[in-house]
Structures are given as structure tokens and as C-alpha cells.
């Protein structure tokens, strides 16, 4: 479950332990300054509290990190990686900033040079040359390992808060709702079939996204 952590408390953790089948990916974006600048004042403190609770209760969790042109160094530094390990997280997904919505800020998108840096940095952190016990995965730059874009029902799709089924968390179009359609019906709907038939969107799996790199 991907979460902003704000609803994780002691009773919730006890219920998760009872269930025994849930892991969490906590959204965090570097230092208190870089994190709260994007996610709102007080969010960093909420994540720290959630990490402490999850670690105390022995609940498996990792991180979900959005890297931007401004925070890329803060969220990939050795210091930050070791800090996450100390808090109890040992794996996580990186997502580069995608300009979606009415308040999108395209200027926050990583530069080509920064994307190249991320490719090299993630591979180093996963290598035997690195002694930090944290395993990072990059939603964009690891496309070569999964055959390109995994969205549109190929490996996953997104359900928003209204129940609308969307090809990807970053692509807000839908022609089916989970409340009145089965998973199979959603996957066979015109939008999802068009997505399916378009795969792969680029032979270069380092450029897998149909919205960002192959519009």
C-alpha cells in the first residue's frame, strides 16, 4: 500500500499485525525542507512517526520517493540512504516528477543529465560495490528490466479515490469504474485494450512512457 503515512497510528499497526499480509511504501522526499516544500508542512514529521511505529511493530515497509530537479541530490545521497535504513526501510521505489494536474510545475522535471545520473546512481546502490543495505528501484529508468511500461494492466493499473480505473497513476483518463465493472471487464475495455495494443511504446526501454516520451 502506497501511503502518505498520516493515518498510521498505534491501533492501525496492531490491526495490520493481526492481518499479517500488508506492506507499506511511505512517501518521503528527502530532508524536512525538501519534503515539506512539496507535501506540506508537518508531513515529514508524520512519516517519521509512522516509520517508528511500523519498525516497532515489525511491519514490512519501504519508501516511495519522487525525485525532482530540485531534490534529486537530497534523496539519493549516502546519508539519506543510511538514514532510511536506520529507520527500518531497506527497499524503495523512485518516481521522477511527472507534471500532471492544474498545478503542474514542468520546471521540476529532472533534466536529461539528471536522469542519466539517476540511472548510474541506482545501479551503483544496488551493486556489490555499495555497502548500504537499501535496494532502490526506479519506476522510469528500470524499464529495460521489465520490457518497458508496465501500466495499462500489463502488470498494474491505478484505481483513483472515486473508483475509476486508470492505465497509470500519472494518466488520469478512465472508461470504467471498479464499482460497476469487474477487473476482467476493465482490462478488456477500449482504453485498456488500446494501451495493450500499443505496447511497447518505444524499443528503447529507457524511454518507456507513452505520455512523457512517446505522446
Predicted regions: what is each one?
Residues 1-95:
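Radical SAM/AdoMet-radical enzyme domain recognition
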Residues 17, 55, 85, 123, ...:
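Alpha-helix boundary recognition
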Residues 41-44, 109-116, 176-181:
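Short, conserved loop/turn and helix-capping segments at secondary-structure boundaries
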Residues 63, 134-135, 195-196:
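Short, hydrophobic secondary-structure boundary micro-motifs
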Residues 165, 170-215:
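Flexible mid-to-C-terminal extensions adjoining Fe-S/redox cofactors in radical SAM and related proteins
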Amino acid at each position: 500500500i502506497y501511503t502518505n503515512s498520516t493515518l498510521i497510528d498505534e491501533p492501525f499497526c496492531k490491526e495490520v499485525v493481526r492481518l499479517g499480509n500488508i506492506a507499506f511504501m511511505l512517501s518521503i522526499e528527502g530532508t524536512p525542507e525538501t519534503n515539506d516544500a512539496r507535501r506540506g508542512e508537518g508531513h515529514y514529521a508524520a512519516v517519521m512517526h509512522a516509520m517508528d511505529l511500523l519498525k516497532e511493530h515489525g511491519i514490512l515497509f519501504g519508501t516511495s520517493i519522487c525525485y525532482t530537479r530540485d531534490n534529486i541530490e537530497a534523496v539519493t545521497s549516502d546519508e539519506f540512504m543510511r538514514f532510511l535504513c536506520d529507520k527500518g526501510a531497506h527497499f524503495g521505489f523512485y518516481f521522477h516528477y511527472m507534471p500532471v494536474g492544474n498545478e503542474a510545475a514542468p520546471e521540476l522535471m529532472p533534466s536529461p543529465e539528471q536522469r542519466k545520473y539517476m540511472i548510474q546512481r541506482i545501479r551503483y546502490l544496488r551493486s556489490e560495490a555499495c555497502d548500504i543495505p537499501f535496494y532502490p528501484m526506479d519506476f522510469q529508468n528500470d524499464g529495460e528490466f521489465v520490457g518497458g511500461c508496465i501500466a495499462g494492466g500489463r502488470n498494474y493499473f491505478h484505481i483513483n479515490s472515486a473508483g475509476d480505473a486508470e492505465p497509470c497513476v500519472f494518466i488520469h483518463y478512465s472508461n470504467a469504474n471498479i464499482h460497476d465493472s469487474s477487473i476482467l471487464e476493465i482490462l478488456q475495455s477500449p482504453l485498456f485494450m488500446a494501451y495493450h495494443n500499443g505496447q511497447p511504446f518505444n524499443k528503447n526501454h529507457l524511454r518507456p512512457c507513452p505520455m512523457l516520451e512517446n505522446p
